A protein has these predicted regions:
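A solvent-exposed, acidic/Ser-Thr-rich amphipathic alpha-helical stretch
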Residues: 31, 35, 48-103, 111
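Residue-level structural signal for beta-strand termini and adjacent loop
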Residues: 112, 135, 151-153
Length: 164
């Protein structure tokens, strides 16, 4: 086998196993993949939480909040957590402000707004609304979200709800 043929075979094998970006994960494609996920946080217009999550999340999906080291949960728990937002923050909205694609990772900077229907994380109901920033790092595998690292500025949101 010639060196050229050998390198062509090696290059083809590497390309088949390359990260999503090398295979063409563009910002529009990333938005197409993550869009249904973020629609779930727009409580007023969202669809069936379980069906959408099963459509866009891998079976072994992990959601890692970063609030406690190593704290991650799977797709079934994520379905429950997201479903509960409709009760606690019935007008919740997630507005995507920026999307960056790096390899198989999609970084999303968003703004979350809402008005709690009752007590939220120990803060009594005040009727006030909040606005906070959220940052997510999504790992994409086979056209689905496989892992999410997310951080929301709940401290800011709770401060707004407590303000006089």
């Amino acid at each position: 086998m010639s060196k050229l043929a050998y390198f062509a075979i090696v290059a083809a094998m590497l390309a088949a196993n390359a990260p999503a970006a090398a295979q063409g994960l563009s910002e529009p494609k990333a938005r197409e993949i993550i869009g249904p996920w973020y629609s779930l946080f727009n409580v007023v217009t969202r669809g069936d939480v379980k069906a959408i999550q099963e459509q866009v999340l891998t079976a072994d999906y992990e959601s890692c909040s970063g609030y406690l080291p190593g704290e991650c949960w799977g797709r079934d728990t994520s379905i429950k957590v997201v479903s509960n937002f409709s009760n606690s923050i019935p007008d919740m909205k997630f507005d995507i402000k920026e999307v960056l694609v790096v390899g198989d990772r999609v970084v999303v900077r968003g703004e979350v707004t809402g008005t709690p229907a009752g007590e939220l994380f120990g803060v009594p109901h005040t009727g006030k609304s909040f606005r906070m920033m959220a940052i997510d790092i999504q790992t994409i595998r086979d056209g689905k979200i496989a892992k999410t690292f997310h951080m929301e500025n709940w401290l800011s949101a709770l401060g707004q709800l407590r303000a006089k």
